[in-house]
Amino acid sequence: MMNKKVIAVALALALAGGSYAQDDTAKKKVKAYMVSDAHLDTQWNWDIQTTINEYVWNTISQNLFLLKKYPEYVFNFEGGVKYAWMKEYYPEQYEEMKKFIEEGRWHIAGSSWEASDVLVPSVEASIRNIMLGQTYYRQEFGKEGTDIFLPDCFGFGWTLPTIAAHCGLIGFSSQKLDWRNHPFYGKSKHPFTIGLWKGIDGKQVMLAHGYDYGRKWNNEDLSKNKDLEKLAQRTPLNTVYRYYGTGDIGGSPTLGSVRSVEQGIKGDGPVEVISATSDQLFKDYLPFNNHPELPVFDGELLMDVHLSLIHI
C-alpha cells in the first residue's frame, strides 16, 4: 500500500514538473539574439586622423565603460586595422580591452583586416583580407573570427559563402538589403531573415539579417517587446537576429539600449533575450545538416542602390 502511495506521489510530481516545463517553454517561445555593434567606416566624409583621434577613441573608451558597468553587455567590433590603431594610439585601453576579449565579452566580429566591399575585389584579394585579419587576431588575442560581418556593404556576390566556407568561417550577417528600393525575391528585399546561403561550389554558411544597426531602445524590458516578437515570427525558427548600436562613426550603443537588453535578459516576457556575439546564432545551429528547418538560398544578394560606390 505504501509503495502505491509513493508511486502515486512520484507520478504527480513528474506530471507537475512536466506542466511547469511546458509553461516555461510557452513563456519563452521566441528567441532574440541581440547583437551590439558600432560600425566604423575607416574613411568616408573625413580623413584617417579624424577616424583615429575621434572615432576609434570613442569606440574603445565608451565600450570599456559599458563593459565595466553592465555585466551582461557584449560588444561586437569588426576590422583588424582599427584594432591595430587602438594598439598604437591607445595602448593602455587596448590592454584593458584584451582582458574583455579573453572573457568573451568584447567580441571580434568578422574575420578580416578591413570590412570592405566584396563585389569589386577579386577572390584572392578577399581571401587575403581574411588571412591578414585572422593572423592579427591570432597573434594579438589568441583567437580568430568565425564569421563575415558586413552591416554596411553594398551587395554580396555568389562567391562570398564559398570564400567564407573555405576560410573556415560559418556565418554571414548584414542589414544592407533593407536599403533596396524594390523587392528582389518575390515581394521581399531578401530571401529570408535566417537560413543557409549556398555558394557557387555548394559550400554553405549560415545567413542572418540584422535589421538596422542604429536601433535604440530607452530603458524597456525587451522580453516584452512586440516588435522583436513579430520579427522572430517571420522565421520558422521563431528567432530574430537583431543588431543595435550605431553606424559609420563608431562609438557605442546608447545607455538606454544596453539597459533594455539587461532588463530583457532578466525579464519574464515571451521573448528570451540573449546578449549575443555576432556568431552565437551560427554556433547554436551547428552542425547545419541537423537543421532541415533552415531554408536555403542559392544565388546572389544584390543591391539596387549605391551602384556606383565602393565602400572601405
What is each model feature region?
Residues A16-Y20:
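C-terminal segment of classical bacterial N-terminal signal peptides
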Residues Q22-I310:
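Catalytic-domain carbohydrate-binding cleft regions of carbohydrate-active enzymes
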Residues V6-L15:
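Sec-dependent N-terminal signal peptides
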Residues M1-M2:
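N-terminal secretory signal peptides that target proteins for export/translocation
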